[in-house]
Amino acid sequence: MRRFLTTLMILLVVLVAGLSALVLLVNPNDFRDYMVKQVAARSGYQLQLDGPLRWHVWPQLSILSGRMSLTAQGASQPLVRADNMRLDVALLPLLSHQLSVKQVMLKGAVIQLTPQTEAVRSEDAPVAPRDNTLPDLSDDRGWSFDISSLKVADSVLVFQHEDDEQVTIRNIRLQMEQDPQHRGSFEFSGRVNRDQRDLTISLNGTVDASDYPHDLTAAIEQINWQLQGADLPKQGIQGQGSFQAQWQESHKRLSFNQISLTANDSTLSGQAQVTLTEKPEWQLRLQFPQLNLDNLIPLNETANGENGAAQQGQSQSTLPRPVISSRIDEPAYQGLQGFTADILLQASNVRWRGMNFTDVATQMTNKSGLLEITQLQGKLNGGQVSLPGTLDATSINPRINFQPRLENVEIGTILKAFNYPISLTGKMSLAGDFSGADIDADAFRHNWQGQAHVEMTDTRMEGMNFQQMIQQAVERNGGDVKAAENFDNVTRLDRFTTDLTLKDGVVTLNDMQGQSPVLALTGEGMLNLADQTCDTQFDIRVVGGWNGESKLIDFLKETPVPLRVYGNWQQLNYSLQVDQLLRKHLQDEAKRRLNDWAERNKDSRNGKDVKKLLEKM
């Protein structure tokens, strides 16, 4: 045993001595020019290494360098620069003075994908033909990334497309490994901070680049992300998921399949693809088993009452995003001009502004700024909602047009969702045509226009009982009638119809008609959506709810009573002209009785005098 251990120690000493001698005999700086030339020959980039190269033996034989940079031909700034670079090399090739790099590690790297880092073609450089009819060579089908392992730590990626704003990804950690067939795996994490928003993302998956650049596929097995900051819910948005991606060079197409993502309590699945032509062509086919927009897009609008107090609807306290000065003068929706799209969305459950929709289906197309929504429908509270329309952003001034169709939708839910303090419930059906310049609740209150026909059933308006108001007014003015007791401060109608017109925040109600077992009304009026005021004029016949029988009751059943309702929605006033009707009724009754008496005494002098008096009245 002692001899065996002695022999083993001798071999170990010889091995260590040999390796040490090899490292001492091979100068890593001898490979500097070789690496620079190889990088330039294979990629066209200029590699610059600052400071001397040195060996690092444990735990992996490596070459260490100081600052390094990688610059494209003619670029004004380097594409990659790093504080340190480590090359893990194989030992045996060094015996023949060859360099075999197994892994490259960059620390403190800054990667810039900006116009300043792009290659610039010299004026005398030859121009390749647009269509290359030469057959592909086997060498053309490999991956230019010929390193088995790449590791990037504590680095930064700066991305900028043309004149757009820069996007900076910080705290990057990237680990990539591949086999000789260019199939590999990767892990990535980073953080993006922009416009007072912070996005943290991490993902891992596999990639197949055996046919790159003609075809590249990747499977994102796990992605985790969290978004926090301005214009977001207080708790932020976080989720996870997986998907598959494929790039097809011949079609310039990027496809996403088997998408499965979550965002807070919302879920998404489906597929998407984009063809990168001069104007990108998008195609989306997405399904949402659950989509809670209230938990993704908070509302900050308020509705002000007469006393100035703000009423918060479904809004949450959020930090507003800063206004970017370069975007102030941009026409609204101009981003639609830069691409085309064919979109099909389906959602089993959608929550928006506190309203719960089911079976939502959307089909729309964008043709370089002309957005056509051919289908946008769903179910709400047992009713049907359809909202097809168009958004024309091809000019400086956008034009939006919608043709809403509602069938048996609870109106109280809609009023509450948009913060209208109107105590009104009932099933509403509506068919209309509205237009404006901005899709926004506040813009609708001020600047939209259109018209619609409205029908409502089982209507209930809290705060006023028209029947009770008229009957009590008749009793107070000495009418010899008795009303049935009704202590509800509610007006109920079995059916109500009207034609409305909207212009700059003012809704004009024409040809209002309503019926119930005790009421029949007609009228017209206006609602000011911005000021939350109204002024309506009704003619009401109380056809039921009276006790007993009398000529006055018969008169009131047949005679419309003028009723004006006006003022702030939360403090309504009314004006009721019952005394004039009663006075007219007494006058007519007196005339009738005098006329009857005069007829019975027409031959007498008194009868003739009364007859003459009635003719003058």
From Swiss-Prot:
One of its GO terms (cellular component) is periplasmic space. Residues 302-321 are annotated as: Disordered. Its main location: membrane. Could be involved in the assembly of outer membrane proteins. May indirectly influence the assembly of outer membrane proteins, potentially by altering outer membrane fluidity. Inhibits the assembly of mutant forms of outer membrane protein F (OmpF). Keywords: Cell inner membrane, Cell membrane, Membrane, Transmembrane, Transmembrane helix. The gene is asmA. The lineage of its organism: Bacteria, Pseudomonadati, Pseudomonadota, Gammaproteobacteria, Enterobacterales. Residues 302-319 have a biased composition (Polar residues). It is found in: Cell inner membrane. The chain crosses the membrane at residues 4-24. It comes from Escherichia coli (strain K12). It is a single-pass membrane protein. Residues 1-3 are cytoplasmic. This is Protein AsmA. Belongs to the AsmA family. It holds the Pfam family AsmA. It comes from the Bacteria. GO terms for biological process: regulation of protein targeting to membrane. Disruption phenotype: The mutant does not exhibit growth defects but it shows a slight increase in outer membrane permeability. Cells lacking this gene show a significant increase in sensitivity towards hydrophobic antibiotics. Deletion of the gene also reduces lipopolysaccharide (LPS) levels, affecting the ratios of glycerolphospholipids to LPS and envelope proteins to LPS in the outer membrane. Residues 25-617 are periplasmic.
